[in-house]
């Protein structure tokens, strides 16, 4: 890979050959800004705090750092099967599964074993993987990890590197007491490397970082470039009663094949999905109420194009990395401007063009000024063409 001005190559970090081989297989030529920033510190063993949204390459940043550390340092001569050397804690099941998939891709030429613990999946099945081989990298949600830890199946006293991903989301979801319990089981902060990532640096997040890290390097990637220029943003002013008609007609008139629809509440997500299915659209839903095995099946179906419309809440939609999503529709505007950036970041990934369409009704249009302030620009409100507001003709079997 030729040197290019202003860009850092993975090659420049002198990584282990088996790791470089995996990076080349994935077709990553140059580091993203967060990768270049974080790796410059973490490969020297320093703690780091990174501010970056999903879609910036932060997952690969911390995984490359972990894998390099574990391949360069031999494992302890004696350890239990359930004593991971690296621990990654993330708030949602989808995010854990995605991180583990990326970790499997990056470790394929090494002897490192990656394991996942998530709630909603068979406890015994997860226990069997622990009993079968040593665990090098453990990716887990806080609750399920605590279950294993309290039952004495997992010991965290040999953790060399700990990563807390989406710390702001963990705060929002009330996971911090569980995370504290977990961290108490790991070596003292001066004896392990700690990396913390968050989409926002609130006072609460920085307080946690201070408690859990030692003299960390701070890497901030401006989030504005995540609402990327290749996502065309539209806002339709539409009455709440007309939102479903507009959604249905947009999808079916245009023949869109891979669409993500976001709503703020689980009951809204369920209602939208049920109506779409009733009206003959191949749709599925993702929310905290959907059992894990079904969520994984749903994501696979969406990735493979069997599911046309995926309706999700913000928490469930976080960390979904599926290329080829052509449109994101905000059925309701999010209450937190950061969530708007996250939502529209599901489309226009990997340099592709994408379109986001937001429905602003009487109940949620007041969120617009804060979203525009976050984006640093105005988005003009359009009136939808009348043919897109026509009544939905009920399907007859």
Swiss-Prot record:
Name this protein carries in UniProt: ATP-dependent RNA helicase RhlB
GO cellular component labels: cytosol
Residue stretches in coiled coil: none
Primary enzyme class: hydrolase
Gene3D superfamilies xrefs: P-loop containing nucleotide triphosphate hydrolases
Reactions catalysed according to its record: ATP + H2O = ADP + phosphate + H(+)
Subunit field text: Component of the RNA degradosome, which is a multiprotein complex involved in RNA processing and mRNA degradation.
Motif placement: Q motif: 8-36
Residues covered by the Helicase C-terminal domain: 242-392
Segments forming domain Helicase ATP-binding: 39-219
Any one GO MF annotation of this record: ATP binding
Keywords for the protein's UniProt record, in alphabetical order: ATP-binding, Cytoplasm, Helicase, Hydrolase, Nucleotide-binding, RNA-binding
EC code: 3.6.4.13
Subcellular location: Cytoplasm
CDD domains referenced in this protein's UniProt entry, alphabetically: DEADc, SF2_C_DEAD
Upper classification of the organism: Bacteria, Pseudomonadati, Pseudomonadota, Gammaproteobacteria, Pseudomonadales
Entry keyword annotation includes Cytoplasm: yes
Residue window of motif DEAD box: 165-168
Top-level taxon of origin: Bacteria
Family of this protein: Belongs to the DEAD box helicase family. RhlB subfamily.
Biological process terms in GO annotation: RNA catabolic process
UniProt source species: Pseudomonas syringae pv. tomato (strain ATCC BAA-871 / DC3000)
Function recorded in the entry: DEAD-box RNA helicase involved in RNA degradation. Has RNA-dependent ATPase activity and unwinds double-stranded RNA.
């Amino acid at each position: 890979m030729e040197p290019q001005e202003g860009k850092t190559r993975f090659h420049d970090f002198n990584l282990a050959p088996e790791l470089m081989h995996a990076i080349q297989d994935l077709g990553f030529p140059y580091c993203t800004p967060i990768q270049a920033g974080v790796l410059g510190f973490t490969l020297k063993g320093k703690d780091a705090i990174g501010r970056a949204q999903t879609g910036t390459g932060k997952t690969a940043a911390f995984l490359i750092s972990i894998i390099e550390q574990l391949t360069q340092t031999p494992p302890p001569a004696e350890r239990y099967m359930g004593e991971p050397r690296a621990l990654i804690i993330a708030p949602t099941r989808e995010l854990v599964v995605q991180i583990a998939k990326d970790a499997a891709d990056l470790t394929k030429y090494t002897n490192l074993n990656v394991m996942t613990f998530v709630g909603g999946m068979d406890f015994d099945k997860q226990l069997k993987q622990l009993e079968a081989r040593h665990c090098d990298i453990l990716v887990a949600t806080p609750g399920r990890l605590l279950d294993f830890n309290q039952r004495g199946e997992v010991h965290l006293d040999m953790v060399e590197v700990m990563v807390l991903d989406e710390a702001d989301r963990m705060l929002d979801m009330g996971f911090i007491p569980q995370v504290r319990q977990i961290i108490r089981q790991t070596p003292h902060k001066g004896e392990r490397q700690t990396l913390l990532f968050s989409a926002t640096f609130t006072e609460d997040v920085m307080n946690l970082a201070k408690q859990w890290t030692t003299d960390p390097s701070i890497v901030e990637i401006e989030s504005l470039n995540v609402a990327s220029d290749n996502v065309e943003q539209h806002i339709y002013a539409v009455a709440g009663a007309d939102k479903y008609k507009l959604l249905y007609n947009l999808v079916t008139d245009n023949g869109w094949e891979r669409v993500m629809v976001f709503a703020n509440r689980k009951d809204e997500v369920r209602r939208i999905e049920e109506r779409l299915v009733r009206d003959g659209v191949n749709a599925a839903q993702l929310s905290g109420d959907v059992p894990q095995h079904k969520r994984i099946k749903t994501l696979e179906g969406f990735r493979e194009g069997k599911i046309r419309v995926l309706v999700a809440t913000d928490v469930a939609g976080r960390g979904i990395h599926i290329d080829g999503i052509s449109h994101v529709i905000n059925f309701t505007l999010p209450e937190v401007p950061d969530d708007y950036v996250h939502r529209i970041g599901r489309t226009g990934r990997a340099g592709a063009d994408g379109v986001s369409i937001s429905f602003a009704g009487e109940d949620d249009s007041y969120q617009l000024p804060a979203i525009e302030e976050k984006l640093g620009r105005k988005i003009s409100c359009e009136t939808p063409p009348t043919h897109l507001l026509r009544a939905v003709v009920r399907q007859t079997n």
